[in-house]
Amino acid sequence: MFRKQSRPGHSPVSLYLDTESEQTPAILSNTLTDVLSTVPETSEIVIVCIGTDRSTGDSLGPLTGTLLAKNKLDNFKIYGTLASPVHAVNLEEVLADIELRYTSPYIIAVDACLGRVKNVGSLHFEDGPVYPGAAMKKNLPPVGQVHITGIVNVGGMMEFFVLQNTRLHVVMQMAESLSESFVLADRRLQGKKLIKKAYQDRPVPIGGKTVKHEA
């Protein structure tokens, strides 16, 4: 169902997940929670969902963003929906806006990609940025401290035609799995924050006096 590689002292380098597995949202949300728990509290976590609804295969990003926007998320800011997509034309402008709007933003990029036949329908979480438009030989800025790509179809030739003729069912299944993963991760991150706050606010008896615990 998945392949995971890691380095000592680092978050997972490579994680492949099959979106047909019911375990995928739980596994991916655990990975996201572990990685994002190390992000400074002063940083805003921004999910940039890249793509366009003008191409079925390239609609994974905006579909995911639209599903996420329907949820009340405490720890994530969302860019890229069906109504307001992030694509090749406005990508640099969106990234500039994020840098101006947020202090030390931590970006998670979500994008569709093409790959091997055996991996179609898989999600791939990886450290480092994604390079949007690589399959179409576009020269666009890299996006994200980490990224998640969904392998929507087979690559190698006639990429534009392949993206246009990708099954919507495959893309929608990925978007739903991604959305569920982020929602679960958001709840877990919020739970950790509440536990930490409760611990810090807990009165501690010291020398006959009760004082608040200081982390």
What are these regions (language model features)?
Residues 1-107, 112-215:
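N-terminal catalytic or cofactor-binding beta/alpha core of small enzyme domains
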